[in-house]
């Protein structure tokens, strides 16, 4: 069964919409195989987003991701990665379809409520970054 990673970002955690977001995953047929609430260190955030290290937004992204707790979740199901990306909506909430997570809960392109793996290959890397195999059921 395909797995993907979701992160509920600090802005959405602060709005107290964790349950609403997780419920959308389940309603779409995705199973929560693992989840935890954590606070990223600067080192963790820089390592997780290392692919963007040379991009102009990198420092702001890292600063935002360490600004408060996040909820990291392994979602499992048929076409889990694509289904999660559809539920999230466009990166910029102003362009996200109504009813998507970002349209409903995000404030800006920076504070955009959720992260989701962008490929099956990256999903495996991202899941292994946050979870040991024994934590995923």
Swiss-Prot record:
Source taxon at top rank: Bacteria
Residues where ATP binds: 9, 57, 85, 91, 102, 112
CDD domains: NDPk_I
A GO MF term: nucleoside diphosphate kinase activity
PROSITE patterns (alphabetical): NDPK, NDPK_LIKE
Keywords for this protein: ATP-binding, Cytoplasm, Kinase, Magnesium, Metal-binding, Nucleotide metabolism, Nucleotide-binding, Phosphoprotein, Transferase
Family matches, as InterPro entries: NDK-like_dom, NDK-like_dom_sf, Nucleoside_diP_kinase, Nucleoside_diP_kinase_AS
Cofactor: Mg(2+)
NCBIfam families registered for this protein in UniProt: PRK00668.1 (NF001908)
Function: Major role in the synthesis of nucleoside triphosphates other than ATP. The ATP gamma phosphate is transferred to the NDP beta phosphate via a ping-pong mechanism, using a phosphorylated active-site intermediate.
Assembly notes: Homotetramer.
Name of the protein: Nucleoside diphosphate kinase
Gene giving rise to this polypeptide: ndk
């Amino acid at each position: 069964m395909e797995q993907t990673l979701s992160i509920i970002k600090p802005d959405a955690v602060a709005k107290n919409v964790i349950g609403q977001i997780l419920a959308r995953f389940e309603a779409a047929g995705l199973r929560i195989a693992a989840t935890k609430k954590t606070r990223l260190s600067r080192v963790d955030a820089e390592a997780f987003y290392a692919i963007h290290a040379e991009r102009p937004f990198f420092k702001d992204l890292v600063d935002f991701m360490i600004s408060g707790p996040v909820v990291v979740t392994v979602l499992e199901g048929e076409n889990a990665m694509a289904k999660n990306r559809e539920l999230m909506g466009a990166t910029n909430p102003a362009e996200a379809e109504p009813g998507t997570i970002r349209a409903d809960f995000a404030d800006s392109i920076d504070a955009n409520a959720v992260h989701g793996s962008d490929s099956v290959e990256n999903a495996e890397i991202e899941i292994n970054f946050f979870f040991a195999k024994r934590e995923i059921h």
